[in-house]
Amino acid sequence: LWIGRVVGGGGTAGPTVHDSMTWRVAGSLTGDFNDDWGWDVGFQRSRNEFFVGAEDTVKDRLYSALTGFGGPDCDPVTGAPGVGDCRWFNPFGSSLTGTGTVNTPELIDHIQGPYTIDANTRLTTFDGVVTGNFGALPGGPAGIAVGAQVREEETHSDYSELANQDAFMFVVGNPDFASSRNVTAAFVELLLPVSEQLDLQLAARTEDYGSGVDSTDPKLTALWRPTESFALRASVGTSFRAPSIFQAFGTQTTLEELTDPLVPGATQFLPVRTRPNLSGKTLRPETADVANLGFTYSPGDNLELGVDYWSFDYTDVIIQQNPQALLDAAVAGDAAAARQIERGPTGGLLRVNSFYDNASSLRTDGLDFSIAYTMELATGTLRLGAQATAVSTYDLADPQAGVIDGAGRRNFANFATSVPELRGNVFMNWQRDIHGVNVYVHHIDSYLDDGQPGSLRPIGSHATVDAQYNLALERFAGVTLSFGGFNLTGEDPPPVATNGGFDSKVHDPRGRLLYARASVSF
């Protein structure tokens, strides 16, 4: 058994190239039919071209070199191991010390192969909107907006030949992929000022993606202002999200940190190939029932207080099957999950094959809080405040992991993301003439790490300080200089038992970042 990098000590890091170019063209025309009615038509065309080039070890070439048949000019039929153009690859340290077979540069170059991705996406959009007033209500004129949109979405990914062959040891490979679709949409919105205190807004939107994938979603919003200092708002509606082109038709191989239940406590990076469900199962659109209820209270010109309750109830959530959940289910006896796990002759994990799937449900709700107080001082205007989000419920049904209470957990072995139950910040803004100072203290509460089977480990809370000083140059109208930093005290993210050592879905590992910026507005 040999575990390590093929070209480790003595080898240089392979070159990696990332090249991305995005361009966008947009235009619109507006006009009026009369004093009450107007129109707007628009066009947009955008394109992103993305190239990645790297090197990785080619499996067959390495295996040949380990048996003495390495090198670009070696013929394994007529040659002999280690003779002439056929060379041995020495994986041991003796290849560097001179006490063993030396790995020549030509052999190393031959073992490595190019892994490239040449991808592009294109989006073309036409839309039109007509707006106007169609009557009068006690609170003012009733308004309406009616619109339509046509979108053409295209994507294409071209991988190198070796990548198409799954020839690489680490990044494995990927098949080429190309697809497109046309989407049509229409909407209508009504603004009804029922009284001077009550506004109602009714809206509906319909989208058609073809192949029977369509949805019509209504929304009702109400704003009630019984006094000048108090406002109550509420909304209910539904939402709809169709599978993306990639989720419906694409294939991608990524490397993920997984724990084999047959080898508890040992984590490793393994290739996970996600692709369309080849069983013929159609990926359904994701739908949600959405509700919000909140208020703002502003007694006077200084204090502002706001509280909002929000709720999202998702059905047919579009997910990538969690590879860790697949592994756990396969070992527990799930025959369908076991067919998606590839193991070697000795039982070692080789690859996990996952699909984009529809989870049964996800329900989450919580509260948003905000408070701010503004003071006019002899030294300038000072504004102090705080904001926080508290997650009350995060219940999900994972196709492999079952019913999960995900609030306050890392959710390593299911489709959800990490969900700390409390996040918030306090801030101070000071402004005087051309000078301004902003200070923010960010806090993320502790939560539980469920990454190891049968155990829950606490992930510590995390607090960072950001600050910025702004100077508006009087001699140059519209020019502002900014100096500041993120995480000024250089706080490290709380440790997590992963190869990276932290939870990349929640915390930023970069430490203290300082910057200077000049901005121009005109």
Q: Which role fits each region the language model picked out?
A:
Residues 1-183, 211, 237-285, 306-365, ...:
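Surface-exposed, low-complexity loop segments enriched in small/polar and acidic residues
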Residues 304, 392-393, 441-449, 471-522:
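C-terminal beta-signal and adjacent terminal beta-strands/loops
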Residues 23-27, 122-128, 184-190, 216-222, ...:
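Hydrophobic, lipid-facing positions within transmembrane beta-strands of outer-membrane proteins
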Residues 41-47, 144-152, 186, 202-206, ...:
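Transmembrane beta-barrel strands of outer-membrane/channel proteins
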Residues 180, 207-216, 371:
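Solvent-exposed loop/turn segments connecting transmembrane beta-strands
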